[in-house]
Amino acid sequence: MKALRAVSLANTAVMLLAVLWGAWVTSSDSGDGCGASWPLCKGTFMPDWDYAAIVEFGHRVVSALAGLLSVAVLVWVARVRPSETRLKRLAFGTFFFVVLQGGLGAAAVLRPQPDLVMALHFGFSLLCFTFALLVTVALGQGERAAFQRPDVSAQPVAPGLRTQIWGLAVYTYLVVYLGAYVRHLGASMACTGWPLCNGELIPPLYGPVGANFAHRLGAALAVVLVLRLWWTARRLTERDDLRRGAAWALALMAAQVASGALFPLGYLNLLTQLLHTGLITGFWGVLSYLCYLTLPVGRETVAVSA
């Protein structure tokens, strides 16, 4: 069983690498590095390598490795844990979104897609990472991971808190999608200065400036919602996992906002964009973990108040 968890952990790490590499492709405008050719690069296995081709083809290799590991985990789970429906669904979810992600990537190469569609590419990559992470978490629960008390899962979560966490997850996904759209639109610098946009409290609400400003407003509300979640969770003395998860979510959200503020202040480069992507991926991972913790585990006893 430890071998299965090791493979699942490797899959999670490769998924994270694929997310970051995809951000590298977008940030460096290397999506056309292999031309209109897929799965080959410029119509061959060994093209004339340039920077864009290396970045794009490297992303394909990492994504293919993620796909192979997802298949391995899915088959392994089905064979050794056939009675655990939730675990099998998580493993299948990983495989499903990897295939969907690969198909969307291939479509983008073979036929140019609008920015609204291209933004889905990053959103699906986050879901790939999410399911891979939760498979690893689920496998670790049987071994009583070090960050949990043995009795922690015996304390169910009140419906109000569950709704709060899942609502934040859905809202965050929409804000992330909007951020991906801003990047594909080339509007990351449409608002200069921070926190004002081009020196205005309310800039024109259309075009690249409007999209960028909408993302800022969405992120600001996300901060408020994360603060509310942390304030609620800090009182849950029976659930150390929820309290720590909410604290991590708050810390990562604060870092994410700071990294986003670097763009309009003149620090828009590959490093800061990868940092921004890495932080939101980490935040999303923590939030997904919190969602997982709200799922019922066995018989409910005493509800945790929100």
Curated annotation (Swiss-Prot):
Enzyme class, broadest EC rank: oxidoreductase
Catalytic activity: Fe(II)-heme o + 2 A + H2O = Fe(II)-heme a + 2 AH2
InterPro entries: COX15/CtaA_fam (IPR003780), COX15/CtaA_HemeA_synthase (IPR050450), HemeA_Synthase_type1 (IPR023755)
Domain of life: Bacteria
Domain notes: The N-half (TM1-TM4) and C-half (TM5-TM8) domains are connected by an intracellular loop. Each domain is formed from four-helix bundles and they align in a pseudo twofold symmetry manner. The N-half domain is the substrate-heme O binding domain and the C-half domain is the cofactor heme B binding domain.
Record membrane topology: Multi-pass membrane protein
Subcellular location: Cell membrane
EC numbers for this chain: 1.17.99.9
Disulfide bonds: 34-41, 191-197
Pathway assigned in UniProt: Porphyrin-containing compound metabolism; heme A biosynthesis; heme A from heme O: step 1/1
Organism: Symbiobacterium thermophilum (strain DSM 24528 / JCM 14929 / IAM 14863 / T)
UniProt cofactor(s): heme b
Binding site residues for heme b: 215, 276
UniProt KW Transmembrane helix keyword: yes
Transmembrane segments: 6-26, 57-77, 90-110, 117-137, 165-185, 207-227, 248-268, 278-298
Protein name (database record): Heme A synthase
